[in-house]
Amino acid sequence: MEFINSSSNYFLNKSTYINLRWIGIIGQFLTINIVAFIFKFEFNYILSNVIVIFGAVSNVFLINYNRSTQLSNKIAFYYLLADILQLSLLLYLTGGILNPFSVFLIIPSVFASSNLNIKTNLILILITILSISVLTLYHQELPSPLNDYKLSNYYYYSIPLGLIIALIFLNYFAILFGK
């Protein structure tokens, strides 16, 4: 892909990125299992945990694959794309855009905006917007005690709209003031 070719000017600090991913993976694992076993909400927690394990395996691979202290623009793109897809799958299984953790979907592209080139970041923004749109229309039920909640369409569609506005706003300012 021409857009994501490596550049010596754009990179991610590998150790910072790995540590942030471990925080996310541990948080996902704890949240899934607390909701499943303590709150006893019904959802596909086995598949959800498999998706989190995929994230952990990719992080171990990242630690051992690249001995450099920096991730090139291209390598960082693929890992951030994997993060967006992993979180999108988790959100699909757990309520889609109605899941309160859906706000975390914008983090990979915001993180990239101050570290990677503009073309790579635009691709990540578009993929994130696509993910938000798909999760608005297609998802499993939001786990809840009685699985009984009603939202007006105004509120329901304001969530993805707010996420997309936040994504664009935060990326704009991170690109403008990030480096």
Give short role names for the model-derived ranges.
Residues M1-L12:
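Short, Lys/Arg-rich, polar N-terminal cytosolic tail immediately upstream
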Residues G55-Q70:
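Canonical alpha-helical transmembrane segments
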Residues A76-Y92, G96-Y138:
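Alpha-helical transmembrane segments of integral membrane proteins
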Residues N19-F29, Y78-Q86:
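Alpha-helical transmembrane segments
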Residues V52-V57, L81-L85, P100-P108, Y157-I165:
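Membrane-embedded alpha-helical segments of multi-pass membrane proteins
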Residues K14, I26, L30-V52, S68-A76, ...:
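Alpha-helical transmembrane segments and their interfaces in multipass membrane proteins
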Residues N9, F177-K179:
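Short, charged amphipathic alpha-helical "coupling" segments at sensory-output junctions
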Residues L12-L20, S68-Y78, L90-L98:
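Short, amphipathic, aromatic/basic-enriched membrane-interface segments that mark the entry/exit
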